[in-house]
């Protein structure tokens, strides 16, 4: 099954940088498309991407949570740190000298689209992007968190576009407990907007989110110091950490982007039985947002097409960003080509 949903009307100029010692090139660009969205009708959108690797190598698309973007890791062309820095590099499963790595900015990530965004829309946008880049099939789609949801949609809507899906900490539906967390976070933003303090509302939402991403065990180890009285108020040990997380997020995220992509997680629903692509599901025991039971249900629904790996980590939903060696070992096996050795 495949869906004809959009046309690319322009390929914007791109930047190309060669690294002569390895043949690795880094390309950034964008395309303008007309996309028929599930809840918002026909929309004119820009799809921004970064493609890094050796010409002719198998292509792996890597997509993260709603805060992720097209820049995966520092490279010769774009030296700034990326969101997947610990997972990409020489000797890793995601080595640009052996794979071409494709990253893209989610629809809505620029904050310009004020409409409901479905994970199906993201998958359809990827299919259009692959057409524009003349990529017939991805060797692999590695999706973490929200990226895993998008990967499931791509596997259903455009199954011939990917050979294998690796879905980390992302299920076929949002857990009601996690949806309640996100609803309260969006209310925090709305309260800030009512008080003309939008950035404060977004910072508070991010601080709530940090509690759901991590685990009580980690907080127990890191923030067990007694509270302090500061300017007549009691301040607990974790507050500096939470304040910093909120400030960093506000500095790089537009409010509308956060709201619409947060909603997109809660709109997500797929039937696991509709996935025909071989899928490796990676679960984290202790993940409060995507519990192990939901990922077991996903794998059961996938049947013979699905397999499951379970990690135990104090980092909960953020384990894919913190347990990079363990994730890399899983990816190395999952993405191995015929004839490749470990």
Describe each region flagged by the PLM.
Residues 22-23, 186-277:
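Alpha/beta-hydrolase
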Residues 50-107:
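N-terminal cap/lid subdomain of alpha/beta-hydrolase-fold enzymes
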């Amino acid at each position: 099954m495949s869906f004809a949903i959009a046309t690319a009307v322009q390929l914007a100029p791109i930047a190309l940088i060669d690294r002569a010692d390895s043949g690795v090139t880094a390309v950034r660009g964008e395309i303008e498309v007309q996309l028929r969205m599930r809840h918002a009708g026909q929309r004119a959108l820009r799809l921004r991407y970064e493609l890094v690797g050796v010409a002719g190598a198998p292509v792996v698309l890597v997509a993260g949570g709603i805060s992720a973007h097209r820049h995966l890791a520092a490279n010769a062309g774009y030296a700034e740190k990326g969101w997947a820095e610990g997972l990409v590099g020489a000797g890793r499963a995601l080595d640009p000298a052996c794979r071409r790595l494709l990253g893209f900015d989610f629809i809505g990530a620029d904050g310009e689209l004020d409409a409901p965004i479905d994970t199906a829309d993201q998958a359809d946008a990827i299919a259009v992007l692959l057409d524009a880049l003349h990529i017939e099939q991805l060797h692999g789609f590695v999706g973490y968190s929200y990226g895993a949801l998008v990967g499931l949609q791509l596997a259903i809507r455009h199954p011939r576009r990917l050979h294998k899906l690796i879905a980390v900490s992302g299920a076929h539906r949002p857990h009601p407990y996690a949806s309640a967390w996100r609803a309260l976070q969006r209310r925090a933003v709305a309260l800030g907007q009512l008080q003309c303090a939008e950035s404060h509302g977004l910072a508070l939402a991010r601080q709530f989110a940090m509690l759901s991403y991590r685990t009580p065990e980690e907080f127990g180890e890191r923030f067990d110091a007694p509270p302090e009285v500061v300017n007549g108020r009691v301040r607990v040990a974790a507050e500096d950490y939470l304040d910093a997380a909120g400030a960093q997020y506000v500095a790089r995220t537009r409010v509308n982007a956060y709201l619409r992509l947060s909603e997109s997680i809660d709109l997500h629903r797929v039937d696991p039985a509709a996935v025909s692509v071989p899928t490796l599901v990676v679960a984290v025991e202790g993940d409060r947002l995507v519990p192990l039971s939901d990922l077991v249900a996903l794998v059961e629904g996938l049947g013979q097409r699905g397999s499951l790996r379970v990690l135990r980590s104090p980092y909960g939903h953020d384990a894919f960003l913190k347990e990079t060696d363990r994730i890399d070992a899983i990816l190395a096996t999952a993405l191995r080509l015929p004839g490749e050795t470990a």
